[in-house]
Amino acid sequence: MDIAHDLQSIGAQEQALVFPHFDPARAWALGNRMHALATSRGHAIAIDIATFGQPLFYAALAGATPDNADWVRRKRNVVAHFRRSSYAIGLRMQQAGATLADKHGLPVAEYASHGGSFPLTVAGAGVIGSITASGLPQRADHEFVVEALCAELGHDYAVLALARS
């Protein structure tokens, strides 16, 4: 894995995966798309879609644990704080040889800079929330969300996917 290349690719994902508008019905549709995709692959994950301060969709699939809900919350907090993907922030911390606690004073009990939470961005409004998955390895959590967003927004996932490790 090339961190610099991944960070560049994640930046492109964040620029491309923007909703023209977003409402609870769209959250429900996206959440159900993610649920169906995860179920078809046998993923034991938790899925969360929220605007800042308001949950819009949550599902814990068979095999997901209460720990996944906590990981969702902590990853979502990273997106809320930085307005960037939790995976991008984690890679930046890895590059710097630092942690969120060291560099930003953010407690590990509240923030997880691991892949899986992606900014929910609306054209003309900016980042308004997050789309999060937890239960797979962090890179796979990140890519699961990106793949679902590509399908929802009509983008070619093969173009936006991170390079295979």
Curated annotation (Swiss-Prot):
Pfam families: HbpS-like. InterPro entries: PduO/GlcC-like (IPR005624), PduO/GlcC-like_sf (IPR038084), YBR137W-like (IPR010371). Belongs to the UPF0303 family. This is UPF0303 protein BceJ2315_15790. It comes from Burkholderia cenocepacia (strain ATCC BAA-245 / DSM 16553 / LMG 16656 / NCTC 13227 / J2315 / CF5610).
